Amino acid sequence: ISKNLWDISSEEMMKYTRMILEKQHPALENVDQPMFVYVLTMREHGPYELGMENTFNLQMPNLGAKSISALNDYTQRIVALNDAIEGMNNYLHERKKPFVLGYFGDHQVAFDNVVPPKKGDYAQPDYVTQFVVRSNCASQFKQEQCFLDLAFSGGILMNVAGLSADDEFMKANMAMCKLSNGKLEDSSNPAFVNDYRHYLYQTLKIAK
């Protein structure tokens, strides 16, 4: 890919994802095990258009005209992303093969250094985003948390897929998710979180 990542549409990224799943590269021809594909889209990221019309009729007292324009641009990009995700979800269902599709946003958006106020009682509201999982697997998974640190997202995907952890790191990660009600950075028990990190880095030595 020779394009700047910021210029590649989310739909184009989904096209490349389908090519991977269909093993359209020689290096994938003999792969006969389940594949994990991580896709990063950047088209939703700034910079945003500052001269766009207020197509979505957006109003917010603390945002100026340029920020409203940027918010319209951001919104149309999110609409395009949603269409791309829905298309991928339909594609995965039509393949009639087991799949787990998870997607999330990595941070909140800001316009002209103005961060819109967030709803909800969160310790770090500017870092709260969404995490969605879809699947056609006959899973016994039940959502137990109303909040989830993205550090635990891998374990959730495994649970939905009906997979158990084979290594000590994932066993600890999945156990911590349950014991801490899905919280890590937002936990009200920092000593417990520090014990978890000590176990990961000092006992398991997951990083050097």
Would you name each region that the model predicts?
Residues I1-K208:
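Solvent-exposed soluble domains appended to multi-pass membrane proteins
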